[in-house]
Design a protein with these regions (language model features):
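Long, contiguous N-terminal structural blocks used for assembly/anchoring
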Residues: 1-60
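Acidic, proline/glycine-rich low-complexity IDRs
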Residues: 1-14, 66, 77-115
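Amphipathic protein-protein interaction modules
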Residues: 42-96
Length: 115
């Protein structure tokens, strides 16, 4: 776990995912991180389907596989229930973000493309 000034958060990287907290967690986070990573990868197609219409609206016809290749590393902000893609490669000026309401990544809301 390290503090990243560019994010203003404590981060922990696991299996290609970045987990972020506003304050350094006091409890052991390994089980939480492992569970979130498993659920994120298990539901990645559902997550992409949730975002796909908005992505197509801006970037044209893209497939689920295109999105998988271009999303980059997600930053999972556990305290705020947000996943942010700062490194997406559709362009160099937008940030993708959505909110998750449960640790299973089954209840997703408020996808946005900001920039």
């Amino acid at each position: 776990m390290e503090f990243r000034k560019d994010l203003g958060q404590y981060i922990y990287e696991y299996e290609g995912l970045i987990f972020a907290w506003d304050e350094e967690p006091e409890e052991d986070i390994q089980n939480t991180v492992e569970s979130l990573a498993e659920n994120y990868f298990k539901n990645l197609d559902v997550i992409i389907d949730f975002m796909l219409a908005d992505i197509k609206e801006i970037y044209g016809e893209v497939t689920v596989e295109d999105v998988k290749e271009k999303l980059g590393k997600p930053v999972i902000d556990y305290n705020n229930g947000k996943v942010t893609y700062y490194e997406q490669s559709f362009d160099d000026c937008h940030i993708f973000e959505f909110e998750f309401m449960d640790d299973a990544f089954e209840d997703l809301q408020y996808f946005s493309i900001d920039g």
